[in-house]
Structure formats: C-alpha cells, structure tokens
Amino acid sequence: MLLGSVPQLDRVAVQLGPFPVYWYGIIIGTGVLLGLWLATREGERLGIPKDTFVDLVLIAVPIAILFARMYYVIFEWEYYAQNPSQIINIRQGGLAIHGGLIGAVITGILFAKRRGVSFWKLADIAAPSILLGQAIGRWGNFMNQEAHGDEVTRQFLEGLHLPDFIINQMYIDGVYYHPTFLYESLWNFAGVILLLALRKVNLRRGELFFTYLIWYSIGRFFVEGLRTDSLMLGPLRIAQVMSIGLVVISIIFIIVRRKMGQADKRYSEN
C-alpha cells in the first residue's frame, strides 16, 4: 500500500469474501502457538503431560483476550460509552497486555488447583513462553501502526539503522514516529534469552515467573514513557503504575515466600 510517496504494509493479510483477515490476529496467533510449543517441550522434560499446556492455552487464551479487552475498554470508557458497538471489535487492536496477564494468572491458578499441580511450576515453565508471545505480538501493533511513540524525523529513524519497511510503516498521517513496538519487542526477546538461561540456574519455584514480571515491567515502564497512546488515569500512565506495582509485588513475594518456607522446592524438582 502507498501513502503519499511512502510505501507501507497493508494491515489486511487476506480478504475472504467480505471478511478481512488482519495481520494483527495472525501475528498474535503465531505468538501463542510458538509459546505453546516452547512450554510443552519444557513441560514434558519436567514430567508435565503435553496436553496440560494445550488444555491450559485453550482455556486461558480466550479468557486473557476477554480481560485484555475489558481492561482497555474500562480505561477508554469515554469513547466506548459513545460507541458501544465497537466494544467487541478487536480485529484491529485494543488489547491491553496487563489486562490479559491478570486474566491468564487467574485462569492458571484455578486450572492448577483443578488439575492438582503446582501453579508456580506451571507459571515458571510458561514464563518464557508468555514473554515470547508478547515479543512477537508487538509486531501486530506494528502492522496496525499503533502503540508508537512521539514524533521523530526520518533521519532519526535512519540513524537507528532500521530497515526501510519499519521506517516506512512508522510514517503515519504525514509524520514519522518512535517505533516503541520495536523497543519493547527487542527487550522482550532479550528477556526470553535471560529466562531460558535462568532455567539452568535452578531457581526456587515461582521465582522464574517473578523474574519475568520484573523484567517485563522494567522495560514496559521506560517504553511507556515514549508512547502517545497510553491508557491514562488522570495524569498517570496506567501501564507505568502497573509496572511499578508488579516489580514491588514480585520482590515482596520472593522475599516473603523464602522467609515463610514456601519456596522450598527448586525449578526442576517434581
């Protein structure tokens, strides 16, 4: 697709009759499938049946999407109160990661209790998969030309040595913008490598998941400061508040669980 003289990628991957299939959904789905593959592979190594994570994903993903949308709509209620028909329209974006994470954790706790397995063990195994899904998912925002930062010049983007297809896609309504989707995606990919390395350290059970929360939240806090479409509560950026809260809560949980003897098992123990 061309916008002026700048070639850009079409957010629609394929048109099936009257129904457009957006890259956003394809990319999110790809992230889920790759994350599932990673989790089932590690789960089998640690004695978790393959169908455990398949069943969990089939339940958790729809609930996470529901929570992600609810979270987004709540903080954009002024718009959706005037446009209620758009509340269920998620084909072009409008999913908040923090909302999805809340839904996934609640589902994971209930699922683990029903299956009679440790939630912390499942959470540790799933942590790199979740972050991988988030890293891939940000490219859906790229295709939608959303979740970007403030205005910049083309020269600034070229100075980052970015490929032309990224630079061109950051040209929106006559202006170039910070590719904050890329900053967060790269941070998340680095986090996946870190978490995979920490598996070999054999941390106490639950601490790999808390490391994920801390790592993601630190990156999200700084990237959010560059964005122009943040969900707001008065003067506060909701994602930054949530990020600070998750870091603090994670550190407290690590300390308290150790002191109370609730972190007695290691990552690889049955």
From Swiss-Prot:
Gene encoding the protein: lgt
Function in brief: Catalyzes the transfer of the diacylglyceryl group from phosphatidylglycerol to the sulfhydryl group of the N-terminal cysteine of a prolipoprotein, the first step in the formation of mature lipoproteins.
Domain of life: Bacteria
Recorded GO CC terms: plasma membrane
UniProt-listed NCBIfam families: lgt
Transmembrane intervals: 19-39, 56-76, 92-112, 116-136, 178-198, 206-226, 236-256
Annotated pathway: Protein modification; lipoprotein biosynthesis (diacylglyceryl transfer)
Chief place of localization: membrane
Family: Belongs to the Lgt family.
Full protein name: Phosphatidylglycerol--prolipoprotein diacylglyceryl transferase
Membrane topology of this protein: Multi-pass membrane protein
Positions contributing to a 1,2-diacyl-sn-glycero-3-phospho-(1'-sn-glycerol) binding: 138
